[in-house]
């Protein structure tokens, strides 16, 4: 059995490569469509929507299947599968010559998804119970750091070598991730392998009969929806606050990245707090303070004030996912980790699909400022629901 610290160090590198490889490409896909693939400016919004949503659609369907296969045949093989298929999809992305081919590449990418759930499943099986919060907080912090680093690398590489080169770099790092799994990560132990629970033949539908896990899946979908509500209009909103200033694109990217910087710092601290105070309590607090922060974020009329709220949002929000992942780990049997994180990923993908649609509708009907207050209402309602459901009652693990 591997030392959990070694596993955490390797997975940290893995997650960093995975995160920045994704974010150094995704923000620039509309530019890739127009500059490299010849899409007309009037059609770019339509093609951007098709290209983005195609991945979510496939990954939503496949995530529970990959999770079930991981529990049956091992987490390591599924992680390797995801790394290599993602590497192939990025490589193909650098070769495409039409928007239709790019859509097919994104479909392949959706088929390949599942690396993050496998990272979570492997870490929760290796981590000591008393270090679970620290490990998941560290992983979330690194994921956030990669999401900040990615657009910076993507912009630099695109300026120097063109956008196609960025796809090949991403393919290289995902292939490197696959090699790390092949040579350095051992299949995690399965404490329940010979346990009587195996006789129960648990299915993914059993999760929906467990109130706590069902509620956490719903919470995961809501949180992801809130994240993506703002995505279609955030850069436009920042531009409207900035006005006519030099280096507008650079300034916009800097302001957006502030929440990622603060989140990378705060996530491990939230994880430690969850270990001491209880993850459900920390989840509730983090959602509540984020809801307050989103309401405040809709108030500033200057870029400087908005930048301060953006940094604060990262501090508040970064406690949500580590707590959510830890709750799922604590209340799931060891031989069900792959499936539960696959289901959580599916719930989050559904939120990812709903968020941009809702954000676009709100911005069109009520204006961009309304988005912040709707996000606040959703988050505050979720925090009150969690508080009244689990106040003074931190459920003990019940394995169906």
Language model segments and positions:
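Juxtamembrane intracellular "pre-TM" segments in multi-pass secondary transporters
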Residues: 1-4, 187-218, 400
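Structural signature of the two symmetry-related core transmembrane helices
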Residues: 77-92, 171, 281-296
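Short amphipathic helix-loop junctions that connect adjacent transmembrane helices
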Residues: 28-45, 233-250
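Cytoplasmic helix-loop-helix junction between adjacent transmembrane helices
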Residues: 105-143
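Intracellular juxtamembrane helix-capping segments at the cytosolic ends
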Residues: 115-127, 319-332
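Conserved MFS/SLC helix-loop-helix module at the cytosolic interface between two early adjacent transmembrane helices
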Residues: 60-97, 274-277
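Symmetry-related core transmembrane helices of the 12-TM Major Facilitator Superfamily/SLC fold
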Residues: 166-183, 372-388
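Central cavity-lining transmembrane alpha-helices of secondary-active solute carriers
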Residues: 50-66, 257-268
């Amino acid at each position: 059995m591997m030392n959990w610290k070694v596993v955490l160090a390797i997975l940290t590198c893995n997650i960093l490569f995975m995160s920045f490889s994704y974010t150094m490409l995704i923000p620039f896909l509309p530019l890739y469509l127009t500059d490299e693939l010849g899409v007309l400016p009037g059609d770019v919004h339509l093609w951007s929507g098709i290209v983005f949503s195609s991945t979510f659609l496939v990954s939503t369907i496949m995530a529970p299947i990959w999770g079930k296969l991981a529990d049956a045949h091992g987490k390591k093989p599924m992680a390797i599968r995801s790394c290599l298929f993602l590497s192939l999809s990025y490589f193909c992305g650098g070769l495409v010559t039409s928007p239709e081919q790019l859509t097919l590449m994104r479909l392949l990418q959706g088929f390949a998804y599942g690396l993050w759930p496998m990272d979570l499943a492997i870490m929760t099986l290796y981590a000591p119970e008393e270090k679970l919060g620290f490990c998941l907080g560290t992983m979330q912090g690194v994921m956030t750091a990669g999401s900040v680093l990615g657009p910076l690398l993507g912009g630099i590489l695109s300026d120097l070598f063109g956008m196609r080169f960025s796809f090949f770099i991403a393919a290289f790092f995902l292939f490197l991730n696959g090699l790390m799994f092949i040579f350095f990560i051992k299949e995690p132990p399965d404490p329940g392998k010979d346990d009587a629970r195996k006789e129960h033949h648990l299915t993914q539908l059993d999760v929906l009969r467990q109130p706590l896990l069902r509620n956490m899946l719903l919470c995961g979908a809501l949180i992801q929806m809130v994240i993506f509500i703002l995505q279609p209009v955030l850069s436009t909103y920042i531009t409207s606050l900035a006005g006519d200033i030099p280096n507008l694109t650079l300034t916009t990217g800097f302001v957006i990245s502030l929440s990622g910087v603060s989140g990378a710092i705060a996530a491990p601290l939230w994880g430690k707090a969850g270990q001491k105070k209880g993850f459900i309590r920390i989840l509730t607090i983090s959602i509540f303070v984020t809801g307050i922060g989103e309401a405040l974020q809709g108030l500033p009329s200057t870029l400087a004030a908005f930048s301060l709220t953006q940094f604060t949002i990262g501090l508040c929000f970064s406690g949500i996912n580590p707590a959510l992942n830890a709750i799922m780990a604590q209340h799931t049997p060891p031989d069900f980790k792959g499936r539960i994180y696959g289901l959580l990923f599916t719930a989050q993908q559904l939120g990812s699909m709903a968020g941009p649609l809702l954000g676009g509708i709100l911005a069109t009907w009520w204006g961009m400022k309304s988005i912040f207050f709707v996000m606040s209402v959703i988050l505050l309602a979720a925090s009150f629901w969690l508080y009244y459901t689990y106040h003074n009652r931190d459920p003990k693990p019940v394995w169906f």
